[in-house]
């Protein structure tokens, strides 16, 4: 009897997801922890590894199909694993996890006693067999660093943790090699014959596009949007970035204008805390957030993603620049985790990178404000009674009028303008 592998709950918030890509097909021989498929849900793409070694008998769910946690997605000929049970399987006889059997403690591994703080909310990537192995060894798996692909924890990592050593990197290279061997050139789509004077084709709405559509409609239906549009002379900002661009490059940092905007926005959120709240009309509550996490809208081939710079108030411009660049690469490669896209208190949308100027950005609900930045263009301005050319930045600030009054919104915009006009103030007030 084949082992039926069901779509698991792997701790990434996935309750259903679209099978974006299969890395295996019927007849393939696989090893435990090989990547079976990529599953996409609500803007994140997660790799699903195999819990067993064996031969793929049948792929049950086609690419582009949405599966629910617990659905059988692939059958694997793995006789030794038929009785294994995994989180997400709904068999009544195995609804509870068996506690580790009490046996004679012959050469029982010492319980890990490291005293470092452990983030109990941390998302852990590990196979069920590895989780069981960690329990048997008395190790809190959330304290273990993973050396496998995408940070996945292996048995060797648990052993290294027990020995007080660093995790081995051999598994990462092995996983990469396996991924390269399994990856195949996707077949070219069948040619479509267009007939008639007004030919049309249809396609299923991708999971990410559905998620984006749902979020946009919910935001516009829930929050009465008001958008303020303004502009500011950024000659000093231009010169400041130019001055430190080479210094940043020497330490491997690509310095752009966006980190300056992040710091200016954080300062505005602190000065006008109404912009750093959520408005819960159903509960009759306003949620005040005493942390400053900035979402950065990123355009990708899959659609709009919003990775988050956590605790932006605690980071330097160089640090923010590095983090934005790293998140942007992950976004383009489809490697962002759910954790990297949640927790924002306010968002920045940069239409300037596409050549845009002013626009009406949609609030990333349940946030109550979003700052849009346009292109920097040379424009004539009046300075000391004379008309001169200067680089001018376009700004658009949308806010939820249930929570933020027009004057508050404009005052916040003025504060951002003031800091971007004189970036040295970021050291004093940012």
From Swiss-Prot:
<feature type="region of interest" description="Disordered">
    <location>
        <begin position="80"/>
        <end position="122"/>
    </location>
</feature>
<feature type="region of interest" description="Disordered">
    <location>
        <begin position="165"/>
        <end position="200"/>
    </location>
</feature>
<dbReference type="GO" id="GO:0004742">
    <property type="term" value="F:dihydrolipoyllysine-residue acetyltransferase activity"/>
</dbReference>
<keyword id="KW-0012">Acyltransferase</keyword>
<dbReference type="InterPro" id="IPR003016">
    <property type="entry name" value="2-oxoA_DH_lipoyl-BS"/>
</dbReference>
<keyword id="KW-0450">Lipoyl</keyword>
<dbReference type="InterPro" id="IPR036625">
    <property type="entry name" value="E3-bd_dom_sf"/>
</dbReference>
<dbReference type="InterPro" id="IPR004167">
    <property type="entry name" value="PSBD"/>
</dbReference>
<feature type="modified residue" description="N6-lipoyllysine">
    <location>
        <position position="43"/>
    </location>
</feature>
<dbReference type="GO" id="GO:0005737">
    <property type="term" value="C:cytoplasm"/>
</dbReference>
<dbReference type="Pfam" id="PF02817">
    <property type="entry name" value="E3_binding"/>
</dbReference>
<dbReference type="Pfam" id="PF00364">
    <property type="entry name" value="Biotin_lipoyl"/>
</dbReference>
<comment type="similarity">
    <text>Belongs to the 2-oxoacid dehydrogenase family.</text>
</comment>
<feature type="domain" description="Peripheral subunit-binding (PSBD)">
    <location>
        <begin position="125"/>
        <end position="162"/>
    </location>
</feature>
<dbReference type="InterPro" id="IPR000089">
    <property type="entry name" value="Biotin_lipoyl"/>
</dbReference>
<feature type="domain" description="Lipoyl-binding">
    <location>
        <begin position="2"/>
        <end position="77"/>
    </location>
</feature>
<comment type="function">
    <text>The pyruvate dehydrogenase complex catalyzes the overall conversion of pyruvate to acetyl-CoA and CO(2). It contains multiple copies of three enzymatic components: pyruvate dehydrogenase (E1), dihydrolipoamide acetyltransferase (E2) and lipoamide dehydrogenase (E3).</text>
</comment>
<keyword id="KW-0808">Transferase</keyword>
<comment type="subunit">
    <text>Forms a 24-polypeptide structural core with octahedral symmetry.</text>
</comment>
<dbReference type="InterPro" id="IPR023213">
    <property type="entry name" value="CAT-like_dom_sf"/>
</dbReference>
<feature type="compositionally biased region" description="Basic and acidic residues">
    <location>
        <begin position="84"/>
        <end position="104"/>
    </location>
</feature>
<dbReference type="InterPro" id="IPR001078">
    <property type="entry name" value="2-oxoacid_DH_actylTfrase"/>
</dbReference>
<dbReference type="InterPro" id="IPR050743">
    <property type="entry name" value="2-oxoacid_DH_E2_comp"/>
</dbReference>
<feature type="compositionally biased region" description="Low complexity">
    <location>
        <begin position="166"/>
        <end position="193"/>
    </location>
</feature>
<dbReference type="Pfam" id="PF00198">
    <property type="entry name" value="2-oxoacid_dh"/>
</dbReference>
<protein>
    <recommendedName>
        <fullName>Dihydrolipoyllysine-residue acetyltransferase component of pyruvate dehydrogenase complex</fullName>
        <ecNumber>2.3.1.12</ecNumber>
    </recommendedName>
</protein>
<dbReference type="InterPro" id="IPR011053">
    <property type="entry name" value="Single_hybrid_motif"/>
</dbReference>
<feature type="active site">
    <location>
        <position position="401"/>
    </location>
</feature>
<dbReference type="GO" id="GO:0031405">
    <property type="term" value="F:lipoic acid binding"/>
</dbReference>
């Amino acid at each position: 009897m084949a082992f039926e592998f069901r779509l698991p709950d792997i701790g990434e918030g996935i309750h259903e997801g679209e099978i974006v890509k299969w890395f295996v097909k019927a007849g393939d021989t696989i090893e435990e922890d090989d990547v079976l498929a990529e599953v996409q849900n609500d803007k994140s793409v997660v790799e699903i590894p195999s819990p067993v070694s064996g031969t793929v008998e049948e792929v049950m769910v086609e690419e582009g199909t949405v599966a629910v946690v617990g659905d059988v997605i692939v059958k694997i000929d793995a006789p030794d694993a038929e009785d294994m049970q995994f989180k997400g399987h709904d068999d009544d006889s195995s609804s509870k996890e068996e506690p580790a059997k009490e046996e004679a403690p012959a050469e029982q591994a010492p319980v890990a006693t490291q005293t470092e703080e452990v983030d109990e909310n941390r998302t852990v990537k590990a196979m069920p067999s590895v989780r069981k192995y960690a329990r048997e060894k008395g190790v809190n798996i959330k304290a273990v660093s993973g050396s496998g692909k995408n940070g996945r924890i292996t048995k060797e990592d648990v052993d290294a943790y027990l020995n007080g050593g660093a995790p081995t990197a051999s598994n990462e290279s092995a996983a990469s090699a396996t991924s390269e061997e399994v990856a195949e050139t996707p077949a070219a789509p069948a040619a479509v014959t267009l007939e008639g004077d007004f030919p049309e084709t249809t396609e299923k709405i991708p999971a990410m596009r559905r998620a984006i559509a749902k979020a946009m409609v919910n935001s516009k239906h829930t929050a009465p949007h008001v958008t303020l549009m303004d502009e500011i002379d950024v000659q000093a900002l231009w010169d400041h970035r130019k001055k430190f661009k080479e210094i940043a490059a020497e330490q491997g940092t690509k310095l752009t204008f966006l980190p300056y905007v992040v710091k200016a926005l954080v300062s505005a959120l602190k000065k006008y805390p109404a912009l750093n709240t959520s408005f819960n009309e159903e509960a009759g509550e306003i949620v005040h957030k005493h942390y400053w996490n900035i979402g950065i809208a990123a355009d990708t081939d899959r659609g709009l993603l919003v990775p988050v710079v956590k605790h932006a108030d605690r980071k330097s411009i160089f640090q923010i620049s590095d983090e934005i660049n790293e998140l942007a690469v992950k976004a383009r490669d489809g490697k962002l985790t759910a954790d990297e896209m949640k927790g924002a208190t306010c968002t920045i949308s940069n239409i300037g990178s596409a050549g845009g100027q002013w626009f009406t950005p949609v609030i990333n609900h349940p946030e109550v404000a979003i700052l849009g930045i346009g292109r920097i263009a040379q424009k004539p301005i009046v300075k000391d009674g004379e008309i001169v050319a200067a680089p001018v930045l376009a700004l658009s600030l949308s806010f939820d009028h249930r929570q933020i009054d027009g004057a508050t919104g404009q005052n916040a915009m003025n504060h951002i303008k003031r800091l971007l006009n004189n970036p040295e103030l970021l050291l004093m007030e940012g």
